């Protein structure tokens, strides 16, 4: 498999304890569950209008600046195929689908590497002639958030700054950017529904919308987007739970002598001297984690783990204690 297209979902069998995929493990809110059921039962074509209005209201933007997506990943591919940039810069280590999308249309890509001790970005490392820059905030797999002044440092005339905010529901922040791509996969546990959206200028949204097939966002995704955009309590509650679970997991890893980096998201990046062996031994015990050698700038020592429930996290810590 092309390493740019390797993602955590291929690493976990159905019966494995899945720390490879960063999807919140708790049940979905009842209102969301019912909306999904009602959408599947309906025989109507998808109608994006209510979801678009709800998202616009949440972000206090005109509806013309909202584009629903068949998962956040569609946004990167739409941008690449619609704009055909001259020179793309992608900040790494990070999600690799933007690289794959640009490669598919022949756009040269420069990988701008974060400083590895704290995974900070220096905007001066971005080539001056890059007319599109993609950066994660919060960043996957490092879990950090770039300060607003760093993101502003990417801005430049005739350049589009694209922020992958797929994990932003876990953090009460507005990442900014000319284009912001968000996902319902992570916090709302909707990986299979493929629901995301893009915020940008009305002109760019119109351009992107004109390049895709009709009804690309299914009825279940539209229903989910409408419900989730109006629900501010669930992200707040989950963020509080996550902070406690993540802190407990970090303490357990510290006790085992495992290096981690500070994270605001629902995952942690680990450094393990014998990472490839440990990944295999955990897999033999029915636990899937994400080896990170396929991320530019990382290698076999780096492993990403999701933050799951307290019992699941304790199971992982016990298994790590056995194999370290």
Feature names for model-found ranges:
Residues 284-285, 296-324:
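PLP-dependent enzyme catalytic core of the Aspartate aminotransferase-like
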């Amino acid at each position: 498999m092309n390493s740019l297209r390797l993602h955590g979902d291929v690493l976990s069998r159905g019966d494995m304890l899945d720390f490879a995929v960063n999807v919140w493990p708790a049940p979905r809110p009842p209102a969301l569950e019912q909306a999904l059921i009602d959408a599947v039962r309906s025989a109507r074509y998808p109608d994006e209008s209510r979801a678009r209005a709800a998202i616009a209201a949440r972000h206090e933007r005109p509806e013309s600046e909202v584009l629903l997506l068949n998962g956040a990943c569609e946004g990167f591919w739409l941008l690449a195929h619609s704009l055909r940039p001259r020179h793309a810069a992608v900040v790494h280590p990070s999600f690799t689908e933007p690289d794959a999308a640009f490669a598919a249309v022949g756009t040269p890509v420069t990988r701008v590497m974060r400083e590895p001790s704290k995974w900070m970005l220096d905007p001066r490392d971005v080539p001056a002639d890059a007319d599109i820059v993609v950066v994660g905030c919060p960043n996957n797999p490092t879990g950090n958030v770039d300060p607003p002044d760093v993101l502003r440092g990417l801005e430049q005339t005739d350049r589009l700054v694209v922020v992958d905010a797929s994990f932003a529901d876990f953090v009460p922040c507005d990442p900014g950017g000319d284009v912001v791509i968000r996902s319902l996969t992570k916090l709302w546990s909707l990986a299979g529904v493929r629901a995301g959206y893009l915020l940008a200028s009305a002109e760019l949204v119109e351009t992107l919308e004109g390049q895709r097939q009709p009804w690309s966002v299914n009825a279940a995704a539209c229903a989910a987007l409408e419900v989730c955009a109006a629900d501010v309590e669930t992200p707040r509650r989950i963020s509080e739970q996550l902070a406690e679970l993540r802190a407990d997991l970090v303490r357990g890893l510290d006790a085992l002598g495992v290096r981690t980096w500070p994270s605001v998201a629902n995952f942690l990046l680990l450094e393990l001297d014998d990472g490839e062996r440990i990944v295999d031994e955990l897999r033999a015990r029915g636990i899937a984690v994400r080896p990170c050698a396929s991320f530019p700038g990382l290698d076999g020592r780096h492993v990403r783990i999701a933050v799951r429930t307290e019992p699941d996290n304790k199971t992982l810590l016990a298994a790590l204690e056995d194999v370290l």
